[in-house]
Amino acid sequence: MNKKRQFLLSAALATFMAANAQVTIHVDASNPGVKVSPNLYGIFFEDINHAADGGLYAELISNRSFEDDDKNIPTWKTSAQEGAKIQTQLINKGLLNKAQGKALQLTIAAKPAATASLINEGFWGINAVQGRTYKLSFWAKGSYKGGLKARLTNAKGDKVYAETSLNTKVGKKWTKYTAELTANANDAKAQFELVANGKGTIVLDVVSLFPPTFKNRENG
């Protein structure tokens, strides 16, 4: 027992002395090492807080392929004026291609006087810049009859920064639709809206909105 106590005391004393030991560092400023280029910068990068998607990658639509959750559609929401209805459902059959795991089906009952919208908030907002033109594209199929508009609005949806009517006739086969939106105001917290004024079903996938990209490279 005495030997055990002596060992524990010795260990504690050694730990205390090590923790309080003096350390001296000598720096020889007259003998520098390798010269570092003034153009070389270091930065921490990790795909959190939208450093990649919503950061270096220029895509402005968050969860554009509806793959982020098995049951819900994060960053997407719907809105309908009085007298209109819109329902959403994730589906996993009849998809665009083998790479896609899901698509979003919209069931719409609207009219010109009472519209229904699918809204994306982007990555903590979509940065609308006055005079900037954004390229919109998406894939769709279904059995929908009516008009569709694409918009950039403020977060409340009561200010329209850009709007275009889409020349769409949604049919049974997957078709890619494209358009451009040019913002008339600045708002770092804008949102994207797809506005419907007809009836039927639309299946959507790969909804994309890009600002001008480096060397105008398509898809970022």
Write out the residue ranges for each language-model feature:
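Extracellular and organelle-lumenal recognition/adhesion modules and their flexible linkers in secreted
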Residues: 22-220
